[in-house]
Amino acid sequence: MPNRTVFFVSDGTGITAETFGNSILAQFSAKPRHVRRPFIDTPDKAYQVVREINDTAGREGKRPIVFITLIDTEVRGIIRSAHCLVLDMLGTFVEPLEAEFGIKSNHRVGRFDDISKSQEYTDRIEAINFSLAHDDGQSSKNLDIADVILVGVSRSGKTPTSLYLAMQHGIKAANYPLIPEDFDRGALPSALVPHKKKCFGLTIAPERLREIRHERRPNSKYASLENCRLEVSAAESMMGREGIAWLSSTHKSIEEIATTILRDIRPDRLIY
């Protein structure tokens, strides 16, 4: 898909269109150029986007791919007139559901107007604040209210997973590094012992860990393959002895890791 452009056109922020589009584009190995065009909510704005799409088609010699989330039928029709392949999330999914349910959808742009008043929003903000305060073992206070405590060697994916769980699912996720001193003692950090049942481990292939650490501290003992192998082996042995469930982050996305953790610790969050 070289020299190909993908547009994400929305009458809101464009986040839904982009998320929808990227989930489909992820099935293909090529990486096209991305263009987001949010707040396209009038015919004049739509015609401007059409000109941009047509100019792109002429320049590249291939029609662009256009993902749209547009409520207004006139605006949708204008975008559809462009020289492009239109993939319409609302037309593809919402309209068939209207027919199936026998009711019209609300057709409200984005539906974010009252999100700040919702309990879900409040829970997510609290979870984000908790995860930031308990990142990388910064604090051992209030671990009793954590939903999960991620443990593992440094750079195994604990921080991004913690923040994803907080932002997407309202999970209070702390994370705590397992370091050489812990391996020398052969025991979990003392702060984690009372909360062992809340711990979930992340491990990683030593070769991949070396690559990540080398970017941070090149040519150091910390990043050496031998040290990475020793730390990973010691961490996995410790988690096994302590009965802590764990998974490898080597070939998994943050979304896959988070979903696996949710399935194990909070399956209720998969139903809402």
Swiss-Prot record:
User: Its catalytic activity?
Assistant: [pyruvate, water dikinase] + ADP = [pyruvate, water dikinase]-phosphate + AMP + H(+); [pyruvate, water dikinase]-phosphate + phosphate + H(+) = [pyruvate, water dikinase] + diphosphate
In this chain, ADP is annotated as bound at G152, V153, S154, R155, S156, G157, K158, T159
Highest taxon above the source species = Bacteria
**Top-level EC class as recorded in UniProt:** transferase
Which terms are listed as keywords in the entry?
Kinase, Nucleotide-binding, Serine/threonine-protein kinase, Transferase
Q: Which InterPro entries match?
A: Kinase-pyrophosphorylase, PSRP
* A Pfam cross-reference name: Kinase-PPPase
- Membrane-spanning ranges: none
Q: Which GO terms describe its molecular function?
A: ADP binding; ATP binding; phosphotransferase activity, phosphate group as acceptor; protein serine/threonine kinase activity
So what EC number does this one have? Answer: 2.7.11.33, 2.7.4.28
Q: What does this protein do?
A: Bifunctional serine/threonine kinase and phosphorylase involved in the regulation of the phosphoenolpyruvate synthase (PEPS) by catalyzing its phosphorylation/dephosphorylation.
- Protein family per UniProt: Belongs to the pyruvate, phosphate/water dikinase regulatory protein family. PSRP subfamily.
User: Sorted alphabetically, which HAMAP family does this protein's record hold?
Assistant: PSRP
What's this protein's name?
Answer: Putative phosphoenolpyruvate synthase regulatory protein
Q: What is the species listed in this Swiss-Prot or TrEMBL entry?
A: Methylibium petroleiphilum (strain ATCC BAA-1232 / LMG 22953 / PM1)
